[in-house]
Amino acid sequence: MSYSCSTRNCSSRRIGGEYAVPVVTVSSPEADCLSGIYLPSSFQTGSWLLDHCQETCCEPTVCQSTCYQPTPCVSSPVQVTSRQTTCVSSPCSTTCSRPLTFISSGCQPLSGVSTVCKPVRSISTVCQPVGGVSTICQPTCGVSRTYQQSCVSSCRRIC
């Protein structure tokens, strides 16, 4: 199943530091929404915190039960990624919009609006600590939740 990415906007900062990288924007129908953040390779290290990321993806014309496919995160075991993903399902006119915060060390936010996150191969809810970042790995759901259960029940991002 293919997805097309219409826009992608990200900014970055060092963990525990000030903003040091300007906003990076990718606008291309060929861009893969699910493969990671478009940043120069020198910034794709464990010392960078990627935040304020927003992706707009278009699903096929059939309403799907998942908003996006499971894909691996950036390979660095200490990479912290915070992104807000908007999935639009047509013809269901369903919008799934929620920020996800996770550490790419085998943690996965679970389906739906669950605030539980667990490492893929363990029942523990504690993830590897990264600097001053909280050791609890969980998706952060926004105040505004526009969910339609039929389309979003298994919406998840696996890293």
UniProtKB/Swiss-Prot annotation:
Pfam families: PMG. The keyword Repeat applies. This is Keratin-associated protein 11-1. It comes from Capra hircus (Goat). The keyword S-adenosyl-L-methionine does not apply. In the wool cortex, wool keratin intermediate filaments are embedded in an interfilamentous matrix, consisting of wool keratin-associated proteins (KRTAP), which are essential for the formation of a rigid and resistant wool shaft through their extensive disulfide bond cross-linking with abundant cysteine residues of wool keratins. The matrix proteins include the high-sulfur and high-glycine-tyrosine keratins. Transmembrane segments: none annotated. InterPro entries: Keratin_matx (IPR007659), KRTAP_PMG (IPR007951). Belongs to the PMG family. Sequence repeats lie at residues 107-116, 117-126, 127-136, 137-146. GO terms for cellular component: cytosol; keratin filament. Residues 107-146 are annotated as: 4 X 10 AA approximate repeats. Keywords: Keratin, Repeat. GO terms for molecular function: structural molecule activity. Wool. The gene is KRTAP11-1.
